[in-house]
Structures are given as C-alpha cells and as structure tokens.
From Swiss-Prot:
Protein name: Nitronate monooxygenase
Miscellaneous remark of the record: At physiological pH, 3-nitropropionate (3-NPA) exists in equilibrium with its conjugate base, propionate-3-nitronate (P3N). P3N is a potent irreversible inhibitor of the key enzyme succinate dehydrogenase in the Krebs cycle and electron transport chain. P3N has been shown to be a toxic metabolite to bacteria, plants, fungi, mammals or any organism that uses succinate dehydrogenase.
A matching Pfam family: NMO
GO biological process, alphabetically ordered: response to toxic substance
Keyword Ribonucleoprotein: no
InterPro entries for the chain: Aldolase_TIM (IPR013785), NMO (IPR004136)
Keyword Oxidoreductase tagged: yes
Catalytic activity: 3 propionate 3-nitronate + 3 O2 + H2O = 3 3-oxopropanoate + 2 nitrate + nitrite + H2O2 + 3 H(+)
Coiled coil: none
Keywords: Detoxification, Flavoprotein, FMN, Monooxygenase, Nucleotide-binding, Oxidoreductase
C-alpha cells in the first residue's frame, strides 16, 4: 500500500483550485452557497437526499446558472426503511406531550419521507441527463451497475467512509476518492450499517489510516473549521478537506434564525449524538430535542427516515409558537469556531489561514 504520494491528484480530478470542499448538507446548502464556493476556487456541494428527482434537477440547473465550475451532488444510500407500526406509534405517544405543549397533535401515521438512492431510478435518470460533474454517496454505495452508468456518463464519484472496512468497499466499487468522515463531524454518521459496531474513529486517526492503506485520494472531514484544520488534514495525507459546519453560518444557507443564533452563540460549545430527531445517529448542538432523546424513559425512535417525519412535525409546531429548540441543529465538535461570512469570503479566509499555518510549520523543518 502507498501513502498519498503517487496517487492520482485530487484537485485536477475534481476541477478545483483549492483543497477546500463545502459539505453537501441536505436542507442547509443552496445553489447560491454551492456556486459561491465553486466560483471562489473550492468545490461547492448540494445535498439532494431529501428531494425527489424533479427537485434535484431544479437545483442542479439553478446552480449551473450561477457558476460554470464543477460542483458536487450528494445522495443518501441508506437501506430503504422497514416500517414498524408498533414502534412508530410508541414513538408518537412519547412525543405527544411535546406536541400538546405547542398546541398541536402528532401525525396519526408516519411516512418514509426520503427515498434512498438505492431505490430511486428517477434520480439516476436525472443524473444521467444533467451530468453534474461530481456525485457523492453517504450511508453506503449504490449497485455496481449504477456506478458503471454514472462513470460512463463522465461523472466523478466520491463516497464517505468511517473505517477501513467501508473504505475498502469504496475502493473496490470504482469510486474516485474517499471522504474520511471522523466522529467529530456534524450531522449524520455515514456508517454503511447503523446496526453494526461503530469504531468511532476520529478525523486524525481515520485520515491517516486511509491515506496509508488506500490507493484512492482521501478527503478529510469532521471537526475542520479553519485553515489550521485544513493544514493538519493535508499533513496527515489528505488531498483536501471537507468542511460542513464552517459553512452553515454563511449568508447563503437556508437555515432559520434559531439554528443561526445557536451556532453563533453559547449552544455551539456543546454537541451531542442523537437518533431522536431522524431515527439515525447524528451530531447536533444540544437542544430540547436531543434532551428528549437522552431521557432514560425514551423508547426506541422509529427507524430512519420515518422518525424524521415526526421530528419535522414537532419542530414546525414549536417554531409556530416561537420555540426553535426542536430543530435538527447539526454541528460538528468545533462548532464554536463558526463564522458568519459570505461563502466567497470564508473560502478566501480559509486559504489565507491555510497558508499561514503552513508557513508557521516551516520553523519545525530545520
């Protein structure tokens, strides 16, 4: 096995100038955000896992109208949900008092609100027609036939991995680069099997392991908020860093005032894992919903993404009464370093900090 030296160069492969990738962040990223990052020399991304095929086509075209640079479209490759009426009703009963607190009633029945890319031929058809430069996968991988079709269309492919075993699957599938998602990352863990043991490797350890053991270029992700973090990732053997939380407070995102206020305030100092909001483990700033899930009396949530149907309904009920504490306030462990800047300014600042960090490290080279 080799280190990153001698591997295919990632930046020209993706058509970018800077080793800075804005994480896709379904529900947060917008065409304006992705295009601004692209136009500043990084790789902008859009998460379409929460959209149908028509919605994905729309945002791809909107982004193309704002930039002629390559951008990344991300999909969810989770196992399609298996409904369990008993578990779902128990979960709704647990949430009912919180709905009542805000003058609402829980849904009578929950729905599977997100179609997995594994079972979405319409989304594949959109990609083959629109041909975004890059498509990335989270929660797993599509079939070999789907990967072959995307590659035949000239689309570059990325996939998240949280351990060496998943990285080996990514490599064997013919994907172009691996996103090494450390435990520090905000949002959903990208594990392929949520029921399997999770090594919970940190970004430093995972990036170094994959850089040494894998033939593919590695992109470090998780807890990276500034140029110093990017420099550290590059020193560990990554060819780029993917930043999510760092971009959440950018002016181009779609977050509401409660999420923005939390990220730029004291709430950003504490993040926690919860499955209560969506039915799948994700890192969020601690809030009323994460506390609800941490209650020892809490039953098992409905499965992902069925539980998200209830989570979104409760958040909407609370927001209607001016309470923002039930949102999916996804954030990484270093969220307290977030800055509210236009995306282009943030990319420029990250590049300056990266160069400063590299220069500071030169003193140790003598």
């Amino acid at each position: 096995m080799t280190d990153q030296t001698g591997k295919r160069a990632l930046l020209p492969l993706l058509g970018i100038d800077k080793p800075i990738i804005q994480a896709p962040m379904a529900g947060v990223s917008t065409p304006a955000l992705a295009a601004a990052v692209c136009n500043a020399g990084g790789l902008g991304s859009l998460g379409v896992g929460a959209m149908n095929a028509d919605g994905a086509r729309k945002v791809i075209r909107e982004t193309r109208a704002l930039t002629d640079k390559p951008f990344n479209i991300n999909v969810f490759c989770h196992r399609p949900a298996q409904a369990d009426a008993a578990v779902e009703q128990q979960w709704l009963s647990w949430l009912a008092p919180h709905f009542e607190k805000y003058g609402a009633t829980p849904p009578a029945k929950l729905s599977d609100i997100y179609t997995s890319f594994l079972a979405d031929p319409a989304m594949l058809a959109v990609f083959l027609e629109e041909k975004p430069a890059i498509v990335s996968f989270h929660f797993g991988l599509p079939s070999a036939d789907v990967i072959a079709e995307l590659k035949k269309a000239g689309i570059r492919l990325l996939a998240s991995a949280t351990n060496l075993q998943e990285a080996a699957q990514v490599e064997a599938a013919g994907v172009d680069a691996i996103v090494a998602q450390g435990i520090e990352a905000g949002g959903h863990r990208g594990v392929f099997d949520p029921d399997a043991f999770d090594d919970r490797l940190g970004t430093f350890a995972l990036t170094r392991l994959l850089a040494k053991e894998c033939r593919l270029p590695v992109i470090a992700a998780g807890g990276i908020m500034d140029g110093a973090g990017i420099a550290a990732a590059l020193a560990l053997g990554a060819q780029a860093a993917q930043l999510g939380t760092a971009f959440v407070a950018c002016t181009e995102t779609s977050i509401d005032e409660g999420y923005r206020r939390a990220l730029l305030g004291e709430a950003a100092r504490r993040t926690t894992f919860t499955a209560a909001i969506s039915g799948r483990l994700a890192r969020s700033m601690a809030n009323s919903f994460t506390a609800l899930g941490a209650d020892p009396r809490s039953p098992e949530p409905a499965t992902y993404p069925i539980a998200y149907d209830a989570g979104k309904a409760l958040n909407a009920a609370a927001k209607a009464k001016g309470e923002f504490g039930y949102g999916a306030h996804w954030a990484g462990q270093a969220a307290a370093l977030a800055r509210s800047l236009p995306a282009a300014e943030l990319v420029a600042q990250l590049e300056r900090e990266l160069k400063q960090s590299i220069e500071q490290l030169r003193q140790f080279a003598n």
